[in-house]
Amino acid sequence: MDFEKEYLDAVLVTAGLLFMFLYHLFLLYQYIHDATKTSIGYENKDKETWVQKILKVTELQGTNDDAVGDNVSTGLSVISSNTSATMTLASISLTLCAVIGVWIASSTNKFFPLEMVYGNTSESIISIKYLCLLSCFLLAFSFFVQSARHFVHSNYLLSTPGATKEEDVEKVQKAVERGSIFWSLGLRALYFALNFLLWFFGPIPMCACSIVMVFVLYCHDFRKDSKQSDSRKKG
């Protein structure tokens, strides 16, 4: 029985992580080849259209300073709300990193009784669990900081007077899109952190969480209406 418990982590945890990695590779493949089939690509297209219309309306309004100011301020407030949400998640991720670091430094503390865990409960495995969880939160913090950086940059570009040329529109679109992509990457890091968190309860909950999460993410990441539109076009 000890032999089975010792190698249960190696089998189930590896299987759960492999399942998650393969799903995200499939999602990346779909995003590269046909971004509109994924929710991330579809939302990025909507944001590109939004930026284009914001700057186009600004150009058409011309010398009407009040209308132009209201239009730009609306765009800036939308981006600022995204920046605030990003910085909030970055702060939470950094705080959790600090908490985990203090927890690791205190060798006398235990997450919960090890007798409840069906799996490998050696000190080395517990250290690996902490390091994996800490790495996910550090990655999430890094991604959210990069997302906030691009959103702040798009604020500067959007508020630049006379920024209505095609080049200016593309710059704002790229900044907003990159901010959204890093936001999505930060959320993915938190999803992996949830899996590693359940690993503290044993390899079985971790593997089960990975499988359930993949099915939940699939329903969220892929658009059902894109399949219906494709079938209509073929028909």
Positions of the model-derived regions?
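Membrane-interface amphipathic/juxtamembrane segments adjacent to transmembrane helices
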Residues: 28-76
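Juxtamembrane membrane-interface segments at transmembrane alpha-helix termini
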Residues: 218-230
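Juxtamembrane membrane-interface segments at transmembrane-helix boundaries in membrane proteins
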Residues: 1-8, 73-79, 113-134, 172-194
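Juxtamembrane inter-helical linkers in multi-pass membrane proteins
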Residues: 38-58, 117-118, 155-176
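Multipass alpha-helical transmembrane domains of eukaryotic endomembrane proteins
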Residues: 129, 133-195, 224-225
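Hydrophobic alpha-helical membrane-embedded segments
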Residues: 9-43, 87-103, 130-153
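Transmembrane alpha-helical segments and their cytosolic interface motifs
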Residues: 72-100, 181-207
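Juxtamembrane "helix exit" motif at the C-terminal ends of alpha-helical transmembrane segments
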Residues: 1-2, 94-118, 201-207, 213-218
